[in-house]
């Protein structure tokens, strides 16, 4: 059964994972060529 | 030939990058929605799928009525089970947005053969709309500062504790949908500002209509947007887009708002809305001036201006004088009590105890800021700074939203909810800017590390040589084309880029535009990213903790952990179930107004006052009864046809939100209308106490007696665990009330009014003769004339 501790772990994991995903998005979209040129 | 190849490769690369970014963005948004929904389920998993607190019970009851009887019956619903004997016109006094939303969801699900109960739909409405609010935040922030900032802001809002506190599963209150409506209306306003599209302007008015349907906080929108328009005009940012964004909103929005019964003509008659009309007039004057300026020669324009200003000032003074006279002629100067208490934080505590008595209307403390927005409080200043680099209409709106929301959140703790989205947006912008610089640096350094082909090295050397001489602003415009209005024009023009290259070749250094590019060393960038992940991690852990521990309690079921394990206090439902099973359908139940909604919803009994608090005199009557001695209280309750009196008492289990702790408000509100109730009579040297030092008035009032009747039998001493001392008056009997039910933990106690004795002719004589025979007997009878 899915109890509150499981939900806590899930929410913590998902929250941090989303942070990482957002950083990944910034990394993907970053364009150093334009910055450099 | 090499140039077209490299340009197609670059175009292909950017297309691939955009495609990857798009997929990542969509996936992240989906996960943000999942997080926003799931983080609000602690209340269901830890407790049960149940409606929370007080107001949600009323909303639930209204939704039940709507789903059972349909929309027309709902509009015409006169509820005779509340505010007895006055009743309440529910259809005309309720904000119907939440109810209609949940009712529509329920109807849709049932049409699709998904037979969910109304209660289940109500319980999960708030988490669903939290996901919507996150996506709306993404859209708004994207309009202001680009997709990256939008994603970050949406992620932060999905789990911000301030919003969680009002939108956990079961918290079926107006704010649950209203925050979504608020953010979405702001998004559409900003979108209209950026595009100048009438389509978005119309959508904006419709969204505003939904907000008006949902929450009284719509006045925030109809004041904030005019302030922003005024700001734009004053700072010389007037444009036709501004006109399109504002004028349809005022006209269409006000017409639509007037359709909501609870607002009606207030939309044009109360001062909360006047600012929008005033700015509407100013906007037209400015538009006219710009139009005439285009038609006339500069000299003629100057003459015309002088003429217009002279006439205009005269007209303005006349209009302002009329407005002031109109406003001053209304009793509250055109402002409602709640709005006045927003502008003057001390107003409520001075004049409206019924507003001041609600804990959520108190000013917040500093720790509550840290609890509710956590690290965002420190990120906001950085967000404000990046909003000014460069300042656009959208970013100035975001800053203005934050500034006003900070002020209002300082007035009452409830409005932290309005601050939360602004805090999330600005923090999202700040973090996104940081991520932009850091990830760009990492990517730049990586490309420098791995590029070792001669051409590439030439490129990279060119990059590195020019890296320090590039204008950061233009670079930013290119990386995030959607960020500013001018960006879309700049992005597709490859010609411009070529021209720039040519210029760079021919003129290697342009001293005017030179600025150092923000490229950090690899180690610093990676460390920065890691530190920001750690910061984000702390924020996530705090939010999950707040959701799980602080904001999930439904308040009708309480729990406590001790060495023996988990204790569940389900006294409220026990009491309401008793009322529903053991009293007549038409019996009237009196209690303090806090429990009115619950009593009508759960016990289905008529109440005297409830959480709507529309009639101060009626509430003051109940307050006076509770503050009076037993006999006087019995007379008041009897005059209101009350059969049962319900009190909440926490002294046995240590539940601090009980009626004894709320009692001084009953005295204040009662004393506000009935001057014979005086607060000092209940205080000993200015201190409120119910121990042996308590005043006789306090120890003899009805509330004390109903709470502490037979309390001494529990432990032999009468020790009150909330107040932390033994009570003052331990042994007493009730003369006009009889105890009919006390819940398992003594948290709810229900008393019945003893019936009035029939007057029997000649009984007085008998009593008198009896008194001669036995004086003690007579004394006993005199004490209790109703038996």
Curated annotation (Swiss-Prot), chain A:
This protein's UniProt keywords: Endoplasmic reticulum, Membrane, Signal-anchor, Transmembrane, Transmembrane helix
Lumenal side: 1-8
Pfam families from the UniProt entry: Ost4
TM annotation in the entry: 9-29
Keyword Nucleus listed: no
GO cellular component terms given for this protein: endoplasmic reticulum membrane
Topological category with respect to the lipid bilayer: Single-pass type III membrane protein
Topological domain ranges for the Cytoplasmic compartment: 30-37
Location within or outside the cell: Endoplasmic reticulum membrane
Domain of life: Eukaryota
Family classification: Belongs to the OST4 family.
Subunit annotation: Component of the oligosaccharyltransferase (OST) complex.
Function: Subunit of the oligosaccharyl transferase (OST) complex that catalyzes the initial transfer of a defined glycan (Glc(3)Man(9)GlcNAc(2) in eukaryotes) from the lipid carrier dolichol-pyrophosphate to an asparagine residue within an Asn-X-Ser/Thr consensus motif in nascent polypeptide chains, the first step in protein N-glycosylation. N-glycosylation occurs cotranslationally and the complex associates with the Sec61 complex at the channel-forming translocon complex that mediates protein translocation across the endoplasmic reticulum (ER). All subunits are required for a maximal enzyme activity.
Matches recorded under PANTHER family: DOLICHYL-DIPHOSPHOOLIGOSACCHARIDE--PROTEIN GLYCOSYLTRANSFERASE SUBUNIT 4A-RELATED (PTHR28677), DOLICHYL-DIPHOSPHOOLIGOSACCHARIDE--PROTEIN GLYCOSYLTRANSFERASE SUBUNIT 4B-RELATED (PTHR28677:SF4)
Protein name: Dolichyl-diphosphooligosaccharide--protein glycosyltransferase subunit 4A
Curated annotation (Swiss-Prot), chain B:
Ranges for region Interacts with target acceptor peptide in protein substrate: 592-594
Biased composition (Basic and acidic residues): 477-504
Region (Disordered): 453-507, 759-787
Cytoplasmic side: 1-18, 145-146, 196-197, 235-239, 294-306, 389-394, 438-525
Annotated Basic residues bias: 759-769
Binding site for dolichyl diphosphooligosaccharide: 414, 597
Domain of life: Eukaryota
Glycosylation sites: 604, 611, 615
UniProt-listed Gene3D superfamilies: 3.40.50.12610
Compartments it resides in: Endoplasmic reticulum membrane
Record motif DXD motif 2, residues: 173-175
Subunit composition and interactions: Component of the oligosaccharyltransferase (OST) complex.
Family membership noted in the UniProt record: Belongs to the STT3 family.
Protein name: Dolichyl-diphosphooligosaccharide--protein glycosyltransferase subunit STT3A
Gene for this chain: STT3A
């Amino acid at each position: 059964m899915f109890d509150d501790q499981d939900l806590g772990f899930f929410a913590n994991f998902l929250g941090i994972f989303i942070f990482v995903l957002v950083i990944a998005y910034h990394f993907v979209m970053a364009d150093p060529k334009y910055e450099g040129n | 030939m090499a140039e077209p190849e490299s340009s197609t490769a670059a175009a292909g690369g950017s297309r691939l990058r955009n495609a990857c970014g798009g997929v990542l963005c969509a996936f992240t948004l989906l996960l943000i929605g999942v997080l926003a929904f799931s983080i609000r389920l602690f209340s269901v998993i830890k407790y049960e799928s149940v409606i929370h607190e007080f107001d949600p019970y009323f909303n639930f009851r209204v939704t039940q009525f709507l789903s059972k009887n349909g929309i027309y019956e709902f509009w015409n619903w006169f509820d005779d089970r509340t505010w007895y004997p006055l009743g309440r016109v529910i259809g005309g006094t309720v904000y119907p947005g939440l109810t209609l939303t949940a009712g529509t969801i329920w109807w849709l699900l049932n049409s699709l053969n998904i037979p969910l109960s109304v209660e289940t739909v109500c319980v999960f409405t708030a988490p669903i709309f939290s996901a919507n609010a996150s996506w709306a935040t993404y859209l708004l922030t994207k309009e202001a500062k680009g997709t990256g900032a939008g994603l970050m802001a949406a992620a932060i809002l999905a789990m911000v504790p301030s919003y969680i506190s009002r939108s956990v599963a079961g918290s079926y209150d107006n704010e649950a949908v209203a925050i979504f409506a608020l953010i979405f209306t702001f998004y559409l306003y900003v979108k209209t500002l950026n595009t100048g599209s009438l389509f978005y302007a119309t959508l904006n008015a419709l969204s505003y209509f939904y907000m008006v349907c949902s929450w009284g906080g719509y006045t925030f929108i109809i004041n904030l947007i005019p302030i922003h328009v005024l700001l734009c005009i004053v700072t010389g940012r007037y444009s036709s887009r501004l006109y399109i964004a504002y004028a349809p909103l005022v006209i269409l929005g006000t017409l639509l708002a007037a359709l909501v019964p609870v607002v009606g003509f207030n939309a044009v008659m109360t001062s909360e809305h006047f600012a929008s009309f005033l700015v509407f007039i100013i906007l037209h004057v400015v538009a006219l001036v710009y139009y005439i300026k285009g038609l006339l020669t500069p000299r003629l324009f100057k003459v015309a201006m002088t003429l217009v200003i002279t006439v205009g000032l005269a007209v303005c003074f006349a209009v302002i004088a009329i407005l002031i006279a109109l406003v001053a002629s209304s009793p509250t100067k055109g402002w409602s009590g709640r709005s006045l208490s927003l502008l003057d934080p001390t107003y409520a505590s001075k004049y409206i105890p019924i507003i001041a008595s609600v804990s959520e209307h108190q000013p917040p403390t500093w720790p509550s800021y840290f609890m509710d927005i956590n690290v965002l409080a420190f990120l906001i200043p950085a967000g404000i700074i990046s909003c000014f680099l460069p300042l656009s209409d959208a970013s100035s709106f975001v800053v203005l939203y934050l500034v006003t929301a900070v002020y209002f959140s300082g007035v009452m703790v409830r409005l932290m909810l309005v601050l939360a989205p602004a805090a999330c947006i600005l923090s999202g912008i700040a973090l996104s800017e940081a991520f932009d610089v850091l990830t760009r640096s990492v990517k730049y350094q990586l490309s420098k590390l791995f590029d070792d082909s001669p051409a590439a090295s030439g490129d990279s050397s060119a990059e590195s040589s020019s890296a320090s001489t590039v204008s950061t602003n233009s670079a930013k415009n290119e990386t995030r084309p959607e960020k500013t209005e001018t960006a879309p024009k700049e992005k597709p023009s490859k010609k411009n880029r070529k021209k720039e290259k040519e210029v760079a070749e021919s003129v290697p250094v342009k001293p005017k535009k030179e600025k150092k590019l923000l490229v950090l060393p690899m180690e610093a960038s990676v460390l920065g990213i890691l530190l920001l992940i750690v910061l984000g991690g702390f924020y996530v852990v705090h939010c999950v903790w707040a959701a799980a521990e602080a904001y999930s309690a439904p308040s009708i079921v309480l729990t406590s952990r001790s060495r023996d394990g988990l204790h569940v206090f389900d006294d409220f439902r026990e009491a309401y179930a008793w009322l529903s099973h053991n009293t007549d359908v038409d019996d009237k139940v009196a209690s303090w107004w806090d429990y009115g909604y619950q009593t009508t919803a759960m016990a289905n009994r008529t109440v005297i006052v409830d959480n709507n608090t529309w009639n101060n005199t009626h509430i003051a009557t109940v307050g006076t009864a509770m503050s009076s001695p037993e006999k006087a209280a019995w007379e008041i309750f009897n005059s209101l046809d009350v059969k049962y009196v319900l009190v909440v008492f926490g002294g046995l289990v240590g539940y601090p939100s009980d009626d004894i702790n709320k009692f001084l408000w009953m005295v204040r509100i009662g004393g506000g209308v009935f001057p014979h109730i005086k607060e000092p009579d209940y205080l000993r040297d200015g201190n409120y106490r119910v121990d042996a030092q308590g005043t006789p008035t306090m120890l003899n009032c009805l509330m004390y007696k109903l709470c502490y009747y037979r309390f001494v039998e529990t432990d032999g001493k009468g020790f009150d665990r909330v107040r932390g001392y033994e009570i003052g008056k331990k042994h007493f009997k009730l003369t006009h009330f009889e105890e009919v039910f006390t819940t398992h933990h003594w948290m709810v106690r229900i008393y019945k009014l003893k019936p009035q004795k029939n007057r029997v002719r000649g009984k007085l004589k008998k009593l008198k003769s009896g008194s001669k025979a036995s004086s003690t007997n007579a004394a006993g009878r005199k004490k209790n004339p109703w038996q």
